[in-house]
Amino acid sequence: MKIQLIAVGTKMPVWVKNGFEEYQRRFPKDMPFELIEIAAGKLGKNADIKRILEQEGKAMLAAAGKAKIVSLDIPGKPWTTEQLATQLESWKSDGRDICLLIGGPEGLSTECKQAAEQSWSLSPLTLPHPLVRVIVAESLYRAWSLTTNHPYHRE
């Protein structure tokens, strides 16, 4: 199983890139974890937000292909580390690749939300989308460590 994090935004601060890559490199070879960045629409004073969201959404769904889509969205289901570990095992046994979608400053398009087979809420708080990349990478690595009895996760 391959895990893809499809995120809107291509020019992230160095700390985001470094934080994501720190966890990405820790994943085992049999569970590659990759980042696909989608260019963000141009937001300005007269920007057509609906059109921008639609364009970003189409690009995200095209990148996802036939993989199982999991959206990251506030109204989604919150998972504990243990529940995420169970999800990870379930996804592995399903045999499909997984695509996790992170929207940009305006969120996810309606099409992305509808295409998602699951929706995951990291927090009821609105989080900056660059930070979400790092949180998701760490959370997935922690969940993997729990499933393999790796000492990273401590209770």
Swiss-Prot record:
Q: What is its EC number?
A: 2.1.1.177
Tagged with keyword S-adenosyl-L-methionine = yes
Substrates-to-products reaction catalysed: pseudouridine(1915) in 23S rRNA + S-adenosyl-L-methionine = N(3)-methylpseudouridine(1915) in 23S rRNA + S-adenosyl-L-homocysteine + H(+)
Chief place of localization: cytoplasm
Q: Which GO terms describe its cellular component?
A: cytoplasm
Residues the entry annotates as binding S-adenosyl-L-methionine? 72, 103, 122-127
Under Gene Ontology molecular function, one entry of this record is: rRNA (pseudouridine-N3-)-methyltransferase activity
Q: List UniProt keywords, sorted A-Z.
A: Cytoplasm, Methyltransferase, rRNA processing, S-adenosyl-L-methionine, Transferase
This protein's record includes keyword Methyltransferase? yes
Q: Where in the cell is it found?
A: Cytoplasm
Pfam families, alphabetized = SPOUT_MTase
Q: Which InterPro entries match?
A: Alpha/beta_knot_MTases, RlmH-like, tRNA_m1G_MTases_N
What is this protein for, i.e. what is its function? Answer: Specifically methylates the pseudouridine at position 1915 (m3Psi1915) in 23S rRNA.
The entry assigns this protein to a family as follows: Belongs to the RNA methyltransferase RlmH family.
**Quaternary structure, from the entry:** Homodimer.
Spell out the protein name for this chain.
Ribosomal RNA large subunit methyltransferase H
Q: Which gene encodes it?
A: rlmH
